[in-house]
Amino acid sequence: MKTLVLVAVLGLASLYLLSYASEVQQLSRDEEEFRALVASFGGLFDTEERGVDKEGCRKLFGGCVGDGDCCLHLGCKTRKLPPFADPYCAWDWTFGRK
């Protein structure tokens, strides 16, 4: 009787391990499909394409001389009051790609 219970427990343990291995293999297939899907967007998620990390551009509230100094969707702005006359990069009210 004890042997039969031991064999049953070992059988259940082996079935658990087999099903777990199958699930892990399925997850790796899903991960490969997800990576292929992201790659099919053609670099939509690349930050360089959107101008975020353009070399030499000024980020929000950074100093600037002209609009060309600021990153994408930012323009060189200035305040009218003399203490705040230093130009800075601010949002130019545009969306999407330019």
Curated annotation (Swiss-Prot):
Which residue stretches, if any, does this entry annotate as coiled coil? none
Q: What is known of its domains?
A: The presence of a 'disulfide through disulfide knot' structurally defines this protein as a knottin.
Which organism does this sequence originate in?
Trittame loki
Q: Which InterPro entries match?
A: Huwentoxin-1 (IPR011696)
* Any single GO CC term annotated in Swiss-Prot or TrEMBL for this entry: extracellular region
Q: Which cysteines are joined by disulfide bonds?
A: 57-71, 64-76, 70-89
Protein name in UniProt: U11-barytoxin-Tl1b
Any one GO MF annotation of this record: ion channel inhibitor activity
Q: Which domain of life is it from?
A: Eukaryota
Give the location in the cell.
Answer: Secreted
